[in-house]
């Protein structure tokens, strides 16, 4: 929504409404975004709930990074099995609506980064280190300067990075520059650790403030009869609605046989409008 650009720490820094659409368009093209074409029972149930709540006109089908057919907005007739990049990308298969998007697509339909951005990065010379965790980042000291000089260890000489690999164990690499992109929590955790260890003592005291995350809650609903059909059919998040107070609700599902996930939740029971447990 446009009003988001007038909120938060980025408000007023740029004409975001004019600048950002082109970048969103690039990301959508690379990720093969398309409107959900696998409408399942959970989506229909959400639409029914929206109608009963008086917000039926807010119901919509989500835009998702999945391949349905060559008629998707950013897809084309396949070349060597690749419907997006003229044969330069990996082979893909259409979505079958199994609901397994969030636990790993088994059919090559989900447009994960290893099928676009990372695929081409590696194809053009980048090295990808899978199952590897960064544990330390230490600026390399400038031997020509005194340890009391602020520029002695300010990163201008590069960094020594300690990695923990599942197969190689611990080892180090050096690099001139670093871009941290481990999402809101992962990047901050690593930076807090480096400041605490004294590796990067000049990290801003504003680290950890004004954080933005998904701010969502997963609420499970169980239907005790079978008249509604399987609720696992479709894509992981296939539709959504908005309530009058701005609350956003989406129909989310996991694949059939994923019942074990219910042990991660607690039971809630409402009586006369009050939460009992």
Predicted regions, residues:
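Short intrinsically disordered, low-complexity coil segments enriched in acidic
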Residues: 1-8, 123-124, 157
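Short, solvent-exposed loop/turn elements at domain surfaces
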Residues: 1-3, 104, 229
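Short, solvent-exposed loop/turn and secondary-structure capping segments
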Residues: 2-6, 71-73, 139, 189-194
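C-terminal segments that line or cap access tunnels to active or ligand-binding sites in enzymes
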Residues: 6-8, 21, 25, 36, ...
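Conserved redox-cofactor binding core of oxidoreductases
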Residues: 9-133
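Glycine-rich loop(s) and the adjacent beta-strand/alpha-helix scaffold that form part
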Residues: 13-16, 107, 115, 123, ...
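Low-complexity, polar-biased intrinsically disordered regions enriched in Pro/Ser/Thr/Gly
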Residues: 77-91, 143-153, 273-277
């Amino acid at each position: 929504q446009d009003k988001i650009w007038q909120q938060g720490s980025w408000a007023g820094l740029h004409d975001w409404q004019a600048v950002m659409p082109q970048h969103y368009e690039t990301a959508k093209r690379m990720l093969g975004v398309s409107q959900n074409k696998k409408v399942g029972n959970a989506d229909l149930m959400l639409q029914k709930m929206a109608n009963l709540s008086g917000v039926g006109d807010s119901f919509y089908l989500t835009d998702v990074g999945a391949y349905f057919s060559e008629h998707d907005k950013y897809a084309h007739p396949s070349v060597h099995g690749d419907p997006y990049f003229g044969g330069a990308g990996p082979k893909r298969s259409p979505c079958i609506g199994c609901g397994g998007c969030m636990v790993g697509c088994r059919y090559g339909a989900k447009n994960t980064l290893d099928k676009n951005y990372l695929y081409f990065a590696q194809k053009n010379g980048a090295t990808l280190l899978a199952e590897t965790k960064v544990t330390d980042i230490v600026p390399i000291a400038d031997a020509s300067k005194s340890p009391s000089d602020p520029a002695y260890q300010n990163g201008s000489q590069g960094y020594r990075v300690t990695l923990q690999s599942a197969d190689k164990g611990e080892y180090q690499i050096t690099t001139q520059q670093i871009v941290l992109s481990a999402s809101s929590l992962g990047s901050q955790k690593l930076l807090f650790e480096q400041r605490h260890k004294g590796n990067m003592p000049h990290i801003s005291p504003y680290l950890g403030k004004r954080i933005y995350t998904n701010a969502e809650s997963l609420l499970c609903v169980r239907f005790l009869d079978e008249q509604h059909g399987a609720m696992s059919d479709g894509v992981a998040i296939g539709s959504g609605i908005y309530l009058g107070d701005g609350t956003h609700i989406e129909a989310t599902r996991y694949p059939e046989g994923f019942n074990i996930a219910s042990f991660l939740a607690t039971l809630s029971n409402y009586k006369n409008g009050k939460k009992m447990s």
